[in-house]
A protein has these predicted regions:
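Acidic/glycine-enriched edge-of-secondary-structure segments
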Residues: 1-14, 76
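RNA substrate-binding interface of SAM-dependent RNA methyltransferases
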Residues: 4, 13, 17-20, 24-28, ...
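Short N-terminal or domain-adjacent regulatory/targeting segments
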Residues: 8-20, 81-90
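Structured adenosyl-cofactor binding patch, chiefly the S-adenosyl-L-methionine
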Residues: 20, 78, 123, 140-150, ...
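N-terminal beta-loop-helix "entrance" segment that forms/cooperates
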Residues: 43-51, 68-74
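S-adenosyl-L-methionine/SAH cofactor-binding core of RNA-modifying enzymes
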Residues: 58, 63-98, 141-212
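Short beta->alpha connector loops at strand-helix junctions that form conserved
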Residues: 60-61, 106, 132-133, 161, ...
Length: 268
């Protein structure tokens, strides 16, 4: 049995990319490792480090790995994760100053879909993922961490339970951009969003923006529709959204601070 069953934030990683990413980014999260002989070679450095720390890291048969992973896997690593913090108003000021795009995942039930969002965020340098509604229950699901392929080591998970109130509080300093499969302007036709002095907040939900939250959304964008029975999921759309935002270009300078304004000021 695992030595770390009591940890409420225990996550068992079951793929080599997830285990290696944890070792590179947060090695102190590792608690126990079991690997089959076939996977052990790729995890030699991980096992050596854990052995030096007095942590169990063993080469075992597939049955013992399955016992820990609770699924067929080449290896299993028990990790201890920090308690999820609550999103605070001051956080948004810090993220805005850093130029970070914040993503809110509301109402996700499929860990593989949320994993697609995480991979897109890591690819485009977005590091803050707020979990609202049912999304919060997925935070420590092995399927999420395995599906993210190590990207969760670069993305911070934060709780956002009272989403309506939070969106109202950040309205003066943030541009909330909601995405829907049926409502809003087409993503292909939407103009780039540029708001000097305000940060971008992406609100993403598999069902589209909840009707109660729509009044708090400044821009509602319609996602591309798939053909037939092969519609894009919210996770599939995340890469399109973040690419669109990154291609929007730098914000326009505030009135009176551009090149021509400075030139006129020098002549005055």
């Amino acid at each position: 049995m695992s030595l770390d069953q009591a940890n409420p934030n225990r996550v068992v990683l079951r793929t080599l990319p997830a285990i290696l990413a944890c070792f590179r980014a947060h090695p102190k999260a590792l608690r126990e490792l079991r690997a089959t002989r076939e996977a052990a070679k790729a995890l030699q450095e991980v096992a050596a480090w854990m052995g030096a720390q007095g942590l169990p890291a063993t080469v075992v048969g597939s049955k013992e790995v399955r016992e820990l992973a609770e699924a067929d896997a080449p290896a299993a690593a028990v990790t201890a994760r920090p308690v999820l913090g609550l999103a605070k108003l001051s956080d948004f000021a810090e993220w805005r100053e850093a130029g970070d795009t914040v993503v809110i995942a509301d109402g996700f039930d499929d860990p593989s879909d949320l994993a697609s969002v995480v991979r897109a965020m890591a690819a485009f340098g977005s590091r803050r993922l707020l979990l609202a509604g049912s999304s919060e229950r997925l935070a420590f699901e092995p399927e999420l961490w395995d599906g993210a392929r190590g990207a969760l080591e670069a993305v911070r998970l934060i709780r956002a339970p009272a989403l309506g109130g939070l969106l109202k509080l950040i309205e003066p300093t943030s541009v909330v951009i909601g995405f829907s499969p049926k409502l809003g302007r087409s993503l292909a036709e939407a103009a780039p969003i540029r708001a000097p002095g305000r940060g971008n907040v992406v609100l993403l939900s598999p069902q589209g923006v909840d009707a109660d939250l729509q009044p708090k959304v400044e821009h509602l964008i319609r996602l591309p529709a798939g053909k037939g029975d092969h519609a894009l999921t919210a996770g599939d759309s995340a890469a399109l959204i973040l690419h669109w935002l990154s291609a929007s270009g730098p914000a326009k300078p505030k009135e009176g601070t551009g090149f021509l304004a400075r030139k006129r000021a020098r002549k005055a």
